[in-house]
UniProtKB/Swiss-Prot annotation:
GO terms for molecular function: ATP binding; iron-sulfur cluster binding; metal ion binding; nitrogenase activity. Keywords: ATP-binding, Iron, Iron-sulfur, Metal-binding, Nitrogen fixation, Nucleotide-binding, Oxidoreductase. Binds 1 [8Fe-7S] cluster per heterodimer. It catalyses: N2 + 8 reduced [2Fe-2S]-[ferredoxin] + 16 ATP + 16 H2O = H2 + 8 oxidized [2Fe-2S]-[ferredoxin] + 2 NH4(+) + 16 ADP + 16 phosphate + 6 H(+). The lineage of its organism: Bacteria, Pseudomonadati, Pseudomonadota, Gammaproteobacteria, Pseudomonadales. PANTHER family: LIGHT-INDEPENDENT PROTOCHLOROPHYLLIDE REDUCTASE SUBUNIT B (PTHR33712:SF7). One of its GO terms (biological process) is nitrogen fixation. This is Nitrogenase iron-iron protein beta chain. Hexamer of two alpha, two beta, and two delta chains.
Amino acid sequence: MTCEVKEKGRVGTINPIFTCQPAGAQFVSIGIKDCIGIVHGGQGCVMFVRLIFSQHYKESFELASSSLHEDGAVFGACGRVEEAVDVLLSRYPDVKVVPIITTCSTEIIGDDVDGVIKKLNEGLLKEKFPDREVHLIAMHTPSFVGSMISGYDVAVRDVVRHFAKREAPNDKINLLTGWVNPGDVKELKHLLGEMDIEANVLFEIESFDSPILPDGSAVSHGNTTIEDLIDTGNARATFALNRYEGTKAAEYLQKKFEIPAIIGPTPIGIRNTDIFLQNLKKATGKPIPQSLAHERGVAIDALADLTHMFLAEKRVAIYGAPDLVIGLAEFCLDLEMKPVLLLLGDDNSKYVDDPRIKALQENVDYGMEIVTNADFWELENRIKNEGLELDLILGHSKGRFISIDYNIPMLRVGFPTYDRAGLFRYPTVGYGGAIWLAEQMANTLFADMEHKKNKEWVLNVW
């Protein structure tokens, strides 16, 4: 038996796993303090993305649109960008960073966004807003290639390339978290804090889990500042935790400022978290404290309680963001589970060269399929027509109908998750994330078995 990597066998897409590149750029923009992105395209390119963000995080986020119409699609719509920047800066006096995010329509018609930004910098900003600090950043994210993952990767690079400067080198690291949840950022900051490591966190979205304060105010925007972004050029190392969600920025900093780039591994599970901490130790010289050794021991004890009795040999399908899917698969293997189908939902040609996928191909001793450019039909067809047997599905809420229709238990993980409450508060990374994931997988299986076995199933069946 082998691990086989293959592309989707169809040209068309049936029920996509991902949305498009501009969504990734918009997610970057809401992670920056005093930033509102302008999406140069139709209003739906913003409206539906904002809806998904709000469904997942249960917060409202500010994003703008150039409101492209039919005439702009025919004759060009650079004027819409100029008007959008003018209106945005007039209405929001605190905004300092304005990404201009392109879409499929504006890329196809060839609108010169870089030229418009140059014109605005030399004209409108000097004439109407002479005393304001305003940064206009072009982000080219056509929707007809890639996905929200590649759009995120491009946008992080563009932001870093715009701001990073070499001033006074320091002992900080750059932490490029990738597309994660507030709970993940909190867990990562906890690990760094225990090791006494300072970091420029891209992006600081812990505040998405925002309080409503006694005065009625609430904060629901990112807290990565312009100063943090500038300081990325002074760090001693850059950690891109996800290979496909931050590597472009890490490689830029390495090439421009000779800052070492450490790519991955995504710290999901005990093994990958251990590697992450060892990499931190090597890069900074800071020791791994006993407190983290204690947390590791607690996590190992929790996993030992579940692995052999409840999780071993369970057949799992996983879909979503590639780094998340691969990290979850590695974790499942450590728990003696069998991830039999991995669905990576975009057309990235680099998957075949991914060392983690190569390791799966070399080490897996049962039948595993990894499908690139996949959609949900790749999962449903295997269940419905090819007899794929599964004990568990891991993925975001968009795939819930397959779980419901075929009576297969499913743990919601990834983005977007909107049919279970509060999951964005919990980490999937670090030792805390390992405990949460393992216990949630077990509890999902327990709840399913209650409906399929007698009430004493846990004693008589497992």
